[in-house]
Each structure stands twice: as structure tokens, then as C-alpha cells.
Amino acid sequence: MNLLKKIIYWKLSLQFFLITNFRNKLYDLGLIKSHTFNIPVISVGNLAVGGTGKTPMIEFLIRKFSPNYNVGVLSRGYKRNSKGFILASDLDDAKSIGDEPFQYFTKFKNIKVAVDKKRKRGIKRLIKEGVELILLDDAFQHRRVKPEYSILLSDYENLYYEDYLMPRGKLRESKKGARRANCIVVTKCPEDISNVEKDRIKKLVKPKEYQQLYFSSIVYSDKIFSLNSSKNLIQLKDKKVNLVTGVVNPKGLLRHLKDLGLIVNHFNYPDHYNYLNSDVQNFADQIVITTEKDFTKLRNMDIENLFYLPIEFKIHNQEDLLAEIANRIAY
């Protein structure tokens, strides 16, 4: 980056800091009210733009709490072609409610999924639907709602304390915004992350005395699934496959397939990409492996051998986190 661009980015980042800091001060001083509700609300979000594992975290919480609560997930529905409040139904798709909400709706039939840019209104509508616990997707900066428990995520390979405000970096607000979180989860860690490395990160993150620091990993399945069949990836060793992704960071998925011996041709599209028939013609000639999120958009297109690779969100010391959340939301 040349000197002139650095100066421009620095000035823009300073302006961004002044705006976001002023807004946060208004909430901190109570000059703008944050609303609470008579049912527990759990917020999942991050300080940085881009993928930190919010979707796997939401799905983890759904699996853990839906057996005991009528769970509702509320998202703004990023890049949807609709407006206002929508309670997901069989008439909806990724275009009408957004990629992640449609994935939740498709996978979990025992919960309510809704989208609304105005979270306060969306929560009220979900309460009328009989929801007992609400999960807010990507809502750390949405201070109009004060959650019962706030989870802040940060990517292991791009931790927020090493980042800068936009546009110089990827932060949506100052690093000190992390103090609003009840816990911090470092995501996408190596499965075998050492205690020494955990201690190193803890010293740098410096969680407050009221905050717990957790570490999580993405575990990739050794099986791929279509609408009506599955395959063991080991069967595809030394075979050519087309990997199709429209996510922020597909490196882990690509590495997993190559480590298993697949010959991978990677078609990498922007996050939340809406696939065209002309795109499909480029990669439908081989077995196609994609993410769960992309599968929801590709499954109705003309692709004979389309499979998705599931992932599991593994939190180290997850029972401690679940006990902490359960204690906070027990009314």
C-alpha cells in the first residue's frame, strides 16, 4: 500500500471511529435506550466484517437449547430481495429471506426463523409466535436490543486485537467494544491448539474479569451428502471434483479435501453469491462439492452430482459455556 493510500485510509478510519464511538457513547450514557424483553435473548456477533463462524455458532446453540425451549432465530436477512418482517415458511427461499436464515429453516424444523432489519420489532413478532428463547444472528452492533447474553466471535487467523477500523482494516467499531460481550469465542482454531497458545491469546485479548474466553474449531465431515444419497470422501481419493464456494474464507474446506487426496478444481465466488445458469455450465461436468449454505441455492439448478460437506462446531470446554448461558437465561 503506497503512502498516499495509507494516509487516506487512516483519515477515513479516524472518521469512522468518531462516528461509531459517538453512537456507542449515546447508548452507554442511556441517551438512546436499549430494549429488554420478558424472554431471554442471546446475541451472536463479531467486531469485524466477514466470516467468523456466526452460522455454525447459531446452529450449535439451536441444537443445545431447542430440546428445552421453543427457539426462534432472528436475522436481518442480508442481501434478501424482500423487506420488513418475514416468518420463514415453505414458500421462502434464500432470495426472499437470505442465505443463512434459509439454511436454518431448512435444517431445523422444530424452531421459528424470521428476518427483520428492525430487531426490536422482529423480537416482538416472534414472541407472539410462542417463542421462548431468541437467538440474534450478527447483532453485536445492534444496540437497540440489550441481550441477556452476548457472544463475541473472533477468527483465530484474524483476531480483532490485531485488526484496525474500516477501511484500514475490517473492524466495524473500536476494539474496546469487546467489553460489551459476556464471553469471547476464538473461532476456527486448530483442533489440537495447545494450552501455551491459548495462554498467549488470552494475554493479548485481555478479557475483563466478567468475561470468559473460549476456543472453538471447525470439524469437517468425512462424508458428503446430496438430497438423497451420501458418499465417503475417501472413495473420491485421486479423483477430480469441482469445489464451489460463495463464502468469505473457504481455505479450510479446500485444505480438508486436498488432505484427503482429492484432485480439487476450486470455483471461488464472492460471499452470498447468487449463482446463474451460466455459472453452472462451468462446473457441472464433475462431482460438485459445496458448502451447506451454497447447497441451498444450487440444489434446484441443473447439477446432476451435487453434494455438500457438513461441518461441526466444536467448542473446547463447551459444558462450561452452556452452563454459563443456562444460568443467565434461567427466568
Enumerate the predicted regions with their spans:
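Residue-level signal for inorganic ion chemistry
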Residues: Q15, T55, Y104, D137, ...
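Walker A (P-loop) phosphate-binding motif
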Residues: N24-D90, E191
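A transmembrane-helix-recognition feature enriched in membrane-embedded lipid enzymes
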Residues: M1-P40
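Hydrophobic residues at beta-strand termini and immediately following loops
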Residues: V44, L74, S154, S216, ...
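Short, flexible loop segments at boundaries between secondary-structure elements
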Residues: P270-N274, N305-Y331
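C-terminal accessory "lid"/substrate-recognition subdomains
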Residues: L159-I289
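Short, polar loop motifs at secondary-structure junctions
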Residues: R76-K79, D138-Q141, V248-P250, T291-K297
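Phosphate/Mg2+-binding loops and adjacent switch elements
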Residues: R80-K208
